[in-house]
């Protein structure tokens, strides 16, 4: 009996030992699948899509920084609200109409090549022909000032038209994210990936996009050093700022060509014929009209509250962004200096967004929807109030003490404004977007589809365009006004907007709980 027991013990322990490596391997495989869920046979497809996305997003971040640098330092930060409402919005509608026509007449692959090539051709023309000769091409400062004196209420429109090439560059650069990324890239990727693949691919794409922001920021931060190196290496005679614009847009052109080549390889070498048969760019399904959107929002309190969140976010961010950019021009007076400043801001935005991505899912899972949803308005409100307090009352005793630390009082407002933008954008890309999408989940199918379309159309458009229109209206009525002079007024609108936002989150939480309970 004893021998048998010993034998059985020995057998049991041997069996345990045999199983241990198997269990460890299983755990390692599980962990590696969690960190890197891409299968071997999908690797080339994933890497090529990733490279294409990287090129498009890197371009997006470079031209976003460059357009702000040129317009704020060479025309004025106040003109941004005019460009957003009177320039970008009509051109976005025009671009959508052109795209619908192309979809009905051309092959999907050729649409991509045509649109990206037009963007790149304009950037090349701007870098090497328009910007170096902008003084010849633009209206003379004397003529512009004479026109402003005779038509003071149209001051900002005259400034934008007198420097038409800078305004045009801003509009084209603003169209890139909507056309190249949201439309061309995502339509292509959604057509060639299965639902099962998307669950594993898309989270990694999200992480990559933030890495792209960080790297673009680092490049812009070091722009002046790159500029100096290029001048020394090639003995160039071009002006410092012209060279900065040319360096940025040369990188844009190189990345654009790499992107086109990557797209071609995906179409002809990587994807099989079965995938290619699925590739058809589609004109968006008939979107709801503004009247239909209003009707949908008015019929559902749940959707009304989601739309309120989107409107409040858009207004609050734009109210702080304008005065912050205007304050930054006091210190960063040239396009090169301003681009380096924006680069620093982009680097921090990328790093903090990655942090929020890691923390975000845990906050929702452990603390619930309300806690995750209220974090973004709290961040926007506290940092925004701090910025306005510093910007409006920078002569107070506390700020004099702080100015010894930062050497220049104007830097205090700029630094707090940068912190406000970094934290607000980081939490928006993660917590705000995810909780907003979660709020649709418990609704019934019809309200979910139509309600989302209505809230996205009205909420996003009213948030961005509404804020830009209000600000441009103030500058039309008061042509001598600047962001500094109307900052106190903007602060009160900002406070009211954030209070409505807090109320909407609280009320939406009640609606969300009711809908979840009802759907179970």
From Swiss-Prot:
Keyword Cell membrane in record: yes
Q: Does the keyword Zinc-finger apply?
A: no
| Matches recorded under Pfam families | TLC (PF03219)
Give the encoding gene's name. tlcD
User: What function is annotated for this protein?
Assistant: Provides the rickettsial cell with host ATP in exchange for rickettsial ADP. This is an obligate exchange system. This energy acquiring activity is an important component of rickettsial parasitism.
Q: What keywords is this UniProt entry annotated with?
A: ATP-binding, Cell membrane, Membrane, Nucleotide-binding, Transmembrane, Transmembrane helix, Transport
Q: Extract the InterPro entries matched here.
A: ADP_ATP_car_bac_type, MFS_trans_sf
Which protein, by its recorded name, is this?
ADP,ATP carrier protein 4
Predominantly, its location class is: membrane
PANTHER family, alphabetized: ADP,ATP CARRIER PROTEIN 1 (PTHR31187:SF1), PTHR31187
């Amino acid at each position: 009996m004893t021998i048998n027991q010993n034998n059985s013990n020995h057998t049991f322990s041997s069996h345990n030992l045999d199983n241990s490596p198997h269990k460890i391997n299983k755990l390692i495989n599980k962990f590696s699948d969690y960190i890197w869920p891409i299968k071997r046979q999908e690797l080339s497809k994933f890497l090529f899509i990733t490279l294409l996305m990287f090129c498009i997003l890197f371009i997006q971040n470079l031209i976003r920084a460059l357009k702000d640098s040129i317009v704020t330092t060479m025309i004025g930060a106040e003109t941004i609200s005019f460009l957003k409402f009177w320039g970008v919005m009509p051109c976005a509608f025009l671009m959508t109409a052109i795209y619908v026509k192309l979809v009905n007449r051309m092959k999907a692959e050729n649409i991509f090549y045509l649109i990206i090539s037009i963007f790149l051709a304009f950037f090349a023309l701007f870098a090497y022909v328009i910007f170096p000769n902008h003084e010849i091409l633009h209206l003379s400062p004397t003529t512009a000032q004479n026109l402003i004196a005779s038509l003071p209420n149209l001051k900002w429109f005259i400034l934008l038209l007198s420097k038409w090439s800078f305004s045009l560059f801003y509009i084209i650069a603003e169209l890139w994210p909507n056309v190249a990324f949201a439309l061309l890239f995502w339509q292509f990727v959604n057509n060639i990936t299965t639902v099962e693949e998307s669950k594993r691919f898309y989270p990694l794409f999200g992480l990559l996009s933030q890495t792209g922001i960080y790297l673009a920021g680092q490049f812009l931060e070091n722009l002046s050093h790159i500029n100096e190196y290029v001048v020394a290496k090639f003995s160039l005679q071009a002006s410092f700022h012209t060279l900065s614009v040319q360096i940025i847009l040369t990188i844009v052109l190189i990345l654009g060509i790499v992107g086109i080549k990557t797209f071609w390889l995906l179409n002809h070498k990587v994807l099989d014929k079965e995938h290619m048969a699925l590739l058809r760019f589609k004109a968006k399904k008939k979107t709801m009209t503004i009247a239909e959107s209003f009707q949908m929002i008015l019929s559902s309190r749940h959707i009304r509250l989601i739309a309120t969140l989107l409107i409040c976010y858009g207004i609050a961010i734009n109210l702080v962004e304008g005065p912050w950019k205007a304050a930054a021009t006091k210190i960063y007076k040239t396009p090169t200096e301003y681009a380096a400043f924006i680069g620093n801001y982009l680097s921090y935005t990328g790093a903090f967004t990655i942090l929020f991505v890691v923390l975000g899912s845990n906050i929702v899972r452990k603390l619930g929807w309300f806690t995750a949803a209220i974090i973004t308005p709290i961040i926007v409100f506290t940092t925004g109030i701090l910025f306005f307090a510093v910007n409006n009352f920078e002569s107070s005793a506390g700020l004099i003490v702080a100015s010894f630390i930062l050497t220049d009082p104007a830097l205090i407002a700029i630094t707090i404004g940068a912190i406000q933008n970094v934290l607000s954008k980081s939490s928006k890309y993660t917590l705000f977007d995810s909780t907003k999408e979660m709020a649709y989940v418990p609704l019934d199918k019809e309200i979910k589809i139509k309600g989302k379309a209505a809230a996205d159309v009205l909420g996003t458009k009213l948030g961005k365009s509404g804020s830009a229109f209000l600000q441009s209206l103030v500058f039309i009525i008061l042509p001598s006004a600047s962001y500094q002079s109307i900052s106190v007024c903007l602060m009160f609108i900002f406070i009211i907007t954030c209070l409505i936002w807090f109320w909407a989150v609280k009320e939406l939480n009640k609606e969300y709980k009711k809908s979840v309970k009802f759907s179970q």
